[in-house]
Amino acid sequence: MNQELATNPLNPLAAPRQFDEIKISLASPEEILAWSYGEVKKPETINYRTFKPERDGLFCARIFGPIKDYECLCGKYKRMKYRGLVCEKCGVEVTLQKVRRERMGHIELAAPVAHIWFLKSLPSRIGLMLDMTLRDLERILYFENYVVIEPGLTDLSYGQLLTEEEFLDAQDQYGADAFTANIGAEAIREMLANIDLAATAEQLREELKEATGELKPKKIIKRLKIVESFLESGNRPEWMVLTVIPVIPPELRPLVPLDGGRFATSDLNDLYRRVINRNNRLKRLIELRAPDIIVRNEKRMLQESVDALFDNGRRGRVITGNNKRPLKSLSDMLKGKQGRFRQNLLGKRVDFSGRSVIVTGPELKLHQCGLPKKMALELFKPFIYSRLEAKGLSSTVKQAKKLVEKERPEVWDILDEVIREHPVLLNRAPTLHRLGIQAFEPILIEGKAIQLHPLVCSAFNADFDGDQMAVHVPLSLEAQLEARVLMMSTNNVLSPANGAPIIVPSQDMVLGLYYTTMEREGMKGEGMAFTSLEEVEHALASGAVHLHARITARLPQIDENGNEVITRFETTPGRLRLGALLPKNAKAPFELVNRLLRKKDIQNVIDTVYRYCGQKESVIFCDQIMGLGFREAFRAGISFGKDDMVVPPTKWDLVEETQDQVKQFEQQYLDGLITQGEKYNKVVDAWSKCNDRVTDAMMKTISATKKDEKGAELEPNSVYMMAHSGARGSVSQMKQLGGMRGLMAKPNGEIIETPIISNFKEGLTVLEYFNSTHGARKGLSDTALKTANSGYLTRRLVDVAQDCIIREHDCGTDHAITASAAVNDGEVVSPLSERVLGRVAAEDVLVPGEDVVIVRKNELIDERKADEIEAAGVQNVRIRSALTCESDDGVCALCYGRDLARGTLVNIGEAVGIIAAQSIGEPGTQLTMRTFHIGGIAQGGQQSFIAAAQEGTVAFENESTLENANGELIVMSRNMQLHIKSATGDTLASHKLFYGSKLFVREGDAVARGQKMFEWDPYTLPIIAEKAGVAKYVDLISGISVRDETDDATGMTQKIVTDWRSAPKGNELKPEIIIVDQDGEPVRNEQGNPVTYPMSVEAILSVEDGQEIKAGDVVARIPREGAKTKDITGGLPRVAELFEARRPKDHAIIAEIDGYVRFGKDYKNKRRIAIEPADDTLEPVEYMVPKGKHIPVQEGDFVQKGDYIMDGNPAPHDILRIMGIEALADYLIDEVQDVYRLQGVKINDKHIEVIVRQMLQKIEILDSGDTTLLKGEHVDRDEFEEENAKIEAKGGRQATGEPVLLGITKASLQTRSFISAASFQETTRVLTEAAVQGKRDKLVGLKENVIVGRLIPAGTGGATARVRRIATDRDQEVIEARRAEAEAAAALIAPEDTPAEVGGED
């Protein structure tokens, strides 16, 4: 590889080699010798007196090249004229000193040595080739055991290990020549050299056909794959054992003299010295015919020293230097954050850059930034020099330099010229998304701080409390062009994550705009009428009218036809001011701002202006409202005072009331009416409710409008204005200042029962203060952890998606996914219009029930179309998606849809993968790190009923109910749903009904808003009798499977099912309650099965043995704790868990087929559940469930494919296998979105789809057909299709496979590009594997191109590559045409000549 990339040493200006791919493979000894310029024989480095390299040493000039340019070591030949000559005295070639960076040497080893990467990197490649375990290999290599290489006619077998004694005995028994056995790396080399790859592969294929069981085929496939990769790549197995070691060029492992006669050296020199020393000693020992044991020891030491050189610390103890620090080996040079890949190739330092503190620059325009003069002078030096020379102010660069250093006046004039129209890039670390680097035009300022426009702060996430930013200068014309056209801050108005404007006023500006658009009664000038804006301004200035007075005024508007019309409005002077700034457009009417504007409203205004009035107008508008906001906030003089925090007068009444309640609960607990857990829940519940009521009372007090004696409305409370407008602060912060602080959490996440009743204004008691320190500290440590975790998630996401680029306009696929509104707990959290906006329709969208097309197939759905779809009441739309795109290497534009940051169809070459990764990763720091334990936490108080949110009629789905003795309807199904339908039949809301819920409505009932529809017990899960009869206990034996719990305080006894498996003779028991009739015969259900209720551990029995029961009675209750003690993983860990596709701990079991449930014979501690398929052609499916787990299905229940047989979180792999790709994508998107929605972060679904697409790139082969693919192997989708296409062309049987879901880390490591994978994680493993397979990296992704130092194949880089490709094709055509013409001409001239000669001339 080095040779391929190295430049020609004789010609210093040789052009860099153009290459299309990089291949990595094992180096044969011959190749190593071919690279080498000589053998390093001595461990010496430099003569410390003369500082000249020792001959034949590690820095030898004869091998590696001269120390000074064009000068040999002894100084006989100097200067250019002797170039290329080899000095006969010192043997040094006269050439550039630079060749010492590229010439390699070698060491001839006296004994072969196994390469540690191929030995120890799991799975061990040498071990696989020889079919030996790693332990056996090490025994041979480190001279403990002999191995039989050629058994001859003896009873020994090939590959058998022999101890020293056994070996000697065998020699005595069979004679010394009857068999061959050897020890050490020689033995292994010999065995590897004897392998016939083709024959081995053939034999393995035969074995694979006959192999049965689970593990054997897997093992054979592993060996077969490695044997085949050796065959294909042309590598030989024995090359994994080294006989020659390359020595890297000396300039790459420098030795630098420090003052005081000491040297600073690279660790590699120490490691090489060790190898050379031991190698020379071994040579001498062999020459001296030393005893075997000594030679062996020396060989072992040589093996160890070579191991340390390649990968120190991988085997045995770490070799340390003189200061007890481990030496950095060749592997360590590549690995980790400080390794070559991540430190120097992916993260380079940049020239022409500077950094400084930022301050706010409110008088800048949006596309400008203030650059300190000093910085600009330094950054633009070369430009200034050339301009000075061009103007004749200096004749040489040296002179120009002097002028600049003295800072003469003419230099400043020139700096102004240079800087004009030359954008610079500003970057703030951490750059979490692409808006973290934007281009601005510099404006020269005095001082030393960079001025930043306030509106771009939110994109950079910058504030002015000492943040620093870096400035970079784009040098070439192309770079300046890209900076201006693509990166200018004015082009980044919309966020790529969700398409909403990101240039939005914040803080003071919001407050100013809120204050401007306020309207108050009874202000001065109320009811006046004005003819024009100028008149209003005049009146304001003279004090005749107040900013908030309600007035009537005329304002010119644009109507639908684009004509100007004067319209009258009821408004306030403040709103008129704002309205005057709106661009004149029919789509941006004055009504847009004729109301009280909060932060969200301002964002909508900007969005509307951007969509309909274009970029230029909206940028000007943003700048103007920023100015207005700052100005008005300053004039309003809104400030924050202690008295602005109002403590509600009713607070103490509410607190006392709650304290009484808590006392009652304590008493109930002492009386034994409730358990400790229930008491805890109720207390926490009560305090949360109290907290909410105090907060409501405070908000009522604080937001109430007050009037003065003249009846004029007073200004609202200033703190309320800040919070309400969205400028700063929130209700919860106000609650802590003026209400009560409320409940606090312990460090482990549990809630402390006693709340903090005081607020900050009143001051906390010592105890309260102590209780609140827990949470506060946890918050701080969480934040630190969160940042690191979030960054790591982003890194993994970027790595998995980096090669996902828009490659073509249309892939022509027929596949699509269905989009529908997202509903959570009966609430529509994101409407259909939001989910289809910016997507491409996969088929015509029609108005329901009519033949009217809203959107044509392959048409982009914009805002207007989305609203039409919503208005027409369409329920779901088939849209194209990145998941179903069929492009090779990337996605097509139609499947992706709109580029959210531009608002138009995405361009070819856009790096959508990276944008997706950034959009998901960037808000990561806002997510929580907490895992919620529901160890009885009242999460906002457990809900126990649901009331109708809309009015409509009730409709049930999968109805299965039962009337109990009191005439109440009880839900008996697990997948019954209640829908509320509108008059037109649209579903307004839908609720999942829990088993055992009581229904208050019937099918077809009309419900009003707020009407209670159904309720359930939030703390227990009931088991309900479906038939009347007598309850009979089975295997419910007191003391073995049932314990009687008597509460001391109350004397009440409950029967509770215990874990019967732990009891002696308990394993055979199947505790259940059956229902029998009066004669003791089991009552049967509709399917004819006996009615039985298996009991799970911790269930509380509600009926006695032999008690008569009616249908609908509760037989037993399972505490919800038991049914639901799983932690709810929230926030970042949940997102990571989903993208890593981890199986949840207690994952749900999902039915794979439609059929009937049967309970089979039980195992020791597992229950067997079978599903008998409804379709007779299918096989029954069996599942094992731990005994004592609650199973929600009964014998004979009909389940549908995809139903849960056991509760829990489903494993994403199961969803993919059973329900398919679309269901998996829906699940992942919904789950990820739920986490982000909780934090109020909006991310477009398509970003998650892109990542899921990348997780589904591999296919597992189920049947290999006639292809060379192996069963059970994971291959890339493209490879799979290529292989099948080849076989189809030959008419053979195609391979079949199913998609596999890989977590993002695994998917990144299994990418086709080994360079990208190696720079991500597990560098050694990736490179080892790639070398054995002789992999070629085609350089298609972004990362590999950055690493080899080319333009990335995305954006403008992709465009130039495309143009170049087209040009080459055209040239090729022209050349072909000319050749054809020439041949035709030649044929005309010499028709009697043989055609062979014509071809020869060419």
Swiss-Prot record:
Family of this protein: Belongs to the RNA polymerase beta' chain family.
Subunit annotation: The RNAP catalytic core consists of 2 alpha, 1 beta, 1 beta' and 1 omega subunit. When a sigma factor is associated with the core the holoenzyme is formed, which can initiate transcription.
GO terms of biological process kind: DNA-templated transcription
Any one cellular-component term (Gene Ontology): DNA-directed RNA polymerase complex
UniProt xrefs under HAMAP family: RNApol_bact_RpoC
Stated name of the protein: DNA-directed RNA polymerase subunit beta'
Binding site for Mg(2+): D463, D465, D467
Binding site for Zn(2+) 1: C72, C74, C87, C90
Pfam families assigned: RNA_pol_Rpb1_1, RNA_pol_Rpb1_2, RNA_pol_Rpb1_3, RNA_pol_Rpb1_4, RNA_pol_Rpb1_5
Entry's cofactor comment: Binds 1 Mg(2+) ion per subunit. Binds 2 Zn(2+) ions per subunit.
SMART domains according to UniProt: RPOLA_N (SM00663)
Presence of the UniProt keyword Repeat in the record: no
Entry cofactors: Mg(2+); Zn(2+)
Molecular-function GO terms, alphabetical: DNA binding; DNA-directed RNA polymerase activity; magnesium ion binding; zinc ion binding
Function per UniProt: DNA-dependent RNA polymerase catalyzes the transcription of DNA into RNA using the four ribonucleoside triphosphates as substrates.
Enzyme Commission code(s) on record: 2.7.7.6
Residues annotated to bind Zn(2+) 2: C811, C885, C892, C895
Keywords attached to this entry: DNA-directed RNA polymerase, Magnesium, Metal-binding, Nucleotidyltransferase, Transcription, Transferase, Zinc
InterPro entries xref list: DNA-dir_RpoC_beta_prime, DNA-dir_RpoC_beta_prime_bact, RNA_pol_asu, RNA_pol_N, RNA_pol_Rpb1_1, RNA_pol_Rpb1_3, RNA_pol_Rpb1_3_sf, RNA_pol_Rpb1_4
